From Swiss-Prot:
The chain crosses the membrane at residues 8-28. Belongs to the N-Me-Phe pilin family. Keywords: Disulfide bond, Fimbrium, Membrane, Methylation, Transmembrane, Transmembrane helix. Residues 1-7 form a propeptide. The pili are polar flexible filaments of about 5.4 nanometers diameter and 2.5 micrometers average length; they consist of only a single polypeptide chain arranged in a helical configuration of five subunits per turn in the assembled pilus. The gene is fimA. GO terms for biological process: cell adhesion. It comes from the Bacteria. Major component of the type IV fimbriae that plays an essential role in twitching motility, natural transformation, and protease secretion. This is Type IV major fimbrial protein FimA. Disulfide bonds join 63-105. Its main location: other. One of its GO terms (cellular component) is pilus. It is a single-pass membrane protein.
Length: 160
């Protein structure tokens, strides 16, 4: 009398393991890109916070204001996040009046200099995103940016 087969054969198990390996080969790089994109987006959030400081400084005709001084309550020209450090740079150009033209003020975002050093994606560590502020107050990626285009937030990509 024949006995009934119970369980899976070795070949069936090997096929399942091979399929999982193939799926992981596609999923892991995509997941790493997703993590890098989400961490890169923090830099733009920091830059948005610096818009108010730039607007205040522009009242005095400058992009940068005084350096931070906790004693007097001056907040300074930079903001630090979990994954990035954002600094106000540039020289204001009052001659620019077209809403879509850069006004000379920039925010330089350096990834890997935040409070979570070592916990940032290696794909963006040490990269810079330089945002030029336009006359209308919005930002666009400018010269000096070495952050890969696939990690750059859509809000600041140059229209082509």
């Amino acid at each position: 009398m024949k006995s009934l087969q119970k369980g899976f054969t070795l070949i069936e198990l090997m096929i399942v393991v091979a399929i999982i390996g193939i799926l992981a080969a596609f999923a892991i790089p995509a997941y790493n890109d997703y993590i890098a994109r989400s961490q890169a987006a923090e830099g733009v959030s920091l830059a948005d916070g610096l818009k108010v400081r730039i607007a205040e400084n522009l009242q005095d005709g400058e992009c940068k204001g005084p350096d931070a001084d906790p004693q007097s309550g001056v907040v300074g020209n930079e903001d630090i996040g979990k994954y990035a450090l954002a600094k106000i740079e540039g020289d204001y150009d009052a001659s620019k009046t077209d809403a879509g033209a850069p006004n000379g003020c920039k925010v330089e975002i350096t990834y890997g200099q935040g409070t979570a050093e070592g916990k940032i994606s290696k794909l963006i560590t040490g990269k810079k995103l330089v945002l030029d502020q336009l006359v209308n107050g919005s930002f666009i990626a400018g010269d000096g940016t070495d952050l890969a285009d696939k990690f750059m937030p859509n809000a600041v990509k140059a229209k082509k």
